[in-house]
Amino acid sequence: MYFIQEGVDVVEEVYTAPFASLGPIITQAASGTYRDLAKWTGISLDDTPCKKTGNANPRFPIYLKSYNTTAQAQVYELFKQATTSTSTPFSNALFMFEGYSQQGVKAFNKDATAFAYRGDNLLAAPLLTYTPNGTALDKVASDLGNKIRQILYTGSGETSLHTYVNYAFGDEKATGWYGSEAWRQKRLQSLKGKYDPKSKFSFYAPIA
């Protein structure tokens, strides 16, 4: 768990004290600049999730408005069982729960721009790192990741899946990446046509 606060050398206790009271096994403190963030959080170019190691690193992200404790407990048990058995290929998997300051995001009306998920507060994403070993294992990973996400989705009470396009597994559809409202899709497609008329940047999860 990372607590990162801008403009101070030590994160204020009002944020850390409730978690420190739980008696963590270890805590580490550091101070630096914005450029240190990737290193602190394990996503620099030298860290495993971002290196070309031959591993598969599928994520299954979902935006949430709040945590559903029942769903969280179910996901915890499923993830624990899948990653801790002696024969599991997913022993290097991890689970990201991301929450950021929302003041700037929510300063705009949710319909002011084509970005769809201003009302969401959290991003959850299991990262199932494993060594590829055929399509059967790929399916196991896909089934596991989607099952985890489905539990969180069901617990959210939402009627459409909200996903973070940069983490997306790839089977979510454009409505999950960019919002289910037709006008958002049309606006993004219009901008795509305006700024990239020759589709030079139509690689992963394209809007058009």
Predicted regions and their residues:
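Soluble FAD-dependent oxygen oxidases
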Residues: 1-208
